[in-house]
């Protein structure tokens, strides 16, 4: 993951024990610094991968296998302590984003207020599924007595996506936002696209290539 400024990179790589670990790079001028292992997130974590940093520069999501994992890879969240350059102890974000399967990535597009997470639950070997969701603004505690055990298991495992839609109003608005962003991106791309053939070997693709 590279931040919007293009000067900070988070990535995973094998450490000396052949386990995946998270590292960071800083861009200095035109060059990247030497990789440094992230500090503070290794306690109770055996492997870490698929990092994502929110635009606040402190809220950090990643997938990991560890003592608090439900099964396989789970999504964890931590926050950067800018004073000492370390991260706080990671927390498992829980169900329904985590399951007994591998849950690999959690990303939020703050512009559209739409999130995405990747999992291999109920997928053929070697395949994953990307879910879209509306990021919650707060955690709601539901009365478990109002639901059967089967319903609760279904909610936790997202066995039926339609059960998460409620009245469907927020879902409809989110899809409209996504559609509007897609149209805007297409319009910008088509407006900036230029293919002007100069000769058999030269094609201009930008107006700045023309000189008086």
Model-derived regions: residue spans:
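Short, conserved micro-motifs composed of acidic
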Residues: 1-211
